A protein has these predicted regions:
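Sec/Tat signal peptide C-region and signal peptidase I cleavage site
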Residues: 20-26
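A residue-level marker of the well-folded mature domains of exported/periplasmic proteins
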Residues: 26-334
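Bacterial N-terminal signal peptides that target proteins for export
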Residues: 2-12
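Cleavable N-terminal signal peptides
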Residues: 13-14, 24
Length: 334
């Protein structure tokens, strides 16, 4: 499989039948994962990328919010049959459906985010979430007064362990004595949209001494951010920049530029001349992941903290610090 990197220059719910009505030939399509388009996190980042493309080009796109896993193959076939190109999918659960459908539509280009499908008309985009999580883990440890940090993941799957493992490594890098409290909202897709449980897990972490909690849980993470704000402690957002949700309480957000991936896919994947099948990996060097600093959290991060994070970022890019990727061997050496 071809593996490529996108440069910084490039990185610059309705029913299915209703969505497809009137779809124009070669309009791009985006299918969001379970959890809702407006989850203020992963799916919403994908939506924002589609909207950015629309604003830049004046073009139209079609989209769909999945209601259940059974819709995946049906949605792909219907969009492809209507002439949508490219078809972009957000989420790691698309592997089987896309592997089945892509060969049926050899003239359609597909782009999938967060999983790998080895087909000649598929571009797979992965992110180095572990390196971005390393940086926010370091910032969390530098900010913490208790030395105890929490993590609330969504669905208990390897990808979310990848976030946790990077976070824990970053925390331990700057404070070897840091204590990490790890929890997940569930083992089914419902885990992405359960802010009540996520808030309870954040409270449990606080009860054990945590004063900073990283939420990598999709829509469920909103419960973590709320619980930490209510308690006067700090949270860390994920995927989208969530600093604005609770100014002065969200320490930072581990941003994952799903939005730019979607915009780039809409711009390039519909044309065979610019389509890049194979695997594309976006990391710190490509600004595919990172941490957010803006007017909502700039008073929470000292110049020294930001300087440390930037130094760590440079060392990771240079290869001087190696951040272990949980998904390579299902382990997290700390």
């Amino acid at each position: 499989m071809k593996i490529s990197k996108i440069s910084k220059a490039v990185l610059g719910s309705v029913a299915l039948s209703a969505v497809l009505t009137g779809a124009a030939l070669a309009d791009p399509a985006i299918i969001y994962d379970l959890g809702g388009k407006f989850d203020k996190s992963f799916n919403e980042a994908a939506y924002n990328g589609a909207e950015a493309w629309k604003a830049e080009t004046g073009g139209n796109y079609i989209d769909l919010e999945l209601q259940n896993d059974a819709q995946r193959e049906q949605a792909l076939r219907r969009f492809a049959s209507q002439g949508a190109n490219p078809i972009v999918m957000a989420g790691f659960s698309w592997t089987a459906a896309l592997d089945a459908v892509a060969p049926e539509f050899a003239d359609t280009n597909f782009v999938v985010i967060d999983t790998v499908v080895d087909q000649p008309n598929v571009q797979s985009i992965l992110f180095d979430e572990h390196t971005g999580s390393f940086l926010v883990g370091a910032l969390a440890a530098l900010k913490s007064e208790t030395g105890t940090l929490g993590f609330v993941g969504g669905m208990d799957v390897p990808l979310i362990h990848k976030f946790y493992c990077g976070y824990a490594q970053g925390a331990k890098h700057v404070n070897p004595d840091a204590t990490l409290i790890e929890s997940y909202t569930g083992t089914t897709p419902a885990a992405w949209n359960d802010p009540v449980t996520a808030g309870e897990l954040a409270q449990a972490a606080m009860d054990s001494g945590a004063d900073v909690v990283f939420a990598a849980a999709g829509g469920s993470g909103l419960g973590v951010l709320q619980a930490m704000a209510d308690a006067g402690r700090y949270s860390i957002g994920v995927d989208s920049n969530q600093n604005y949700l609770h100014p002065g309480s969200v320490l930072t957000s581990m941003v994952k530029r799903v939005d730019v991936a979607v915009t780039t896919a809409f711009n390039e994947a519909g044309d065979d001349a610019t389509f890049m099948p194979g695997l594309t990996i976006l990391g710190l060097a490509e600004d595919g992941v990172g941490y957010a600093v803006d007017e909502n959290n700039q008073d929470l991060l000292t110049e020294e903290m930001v300087a440390t994070a930037e130094d760590l970022k440079a060392q990771i890019i240079a290869g001087d610090i190696e951040v272990h990727d949980y998904t390579t061997d299902s382990s997290c050496p700390l």
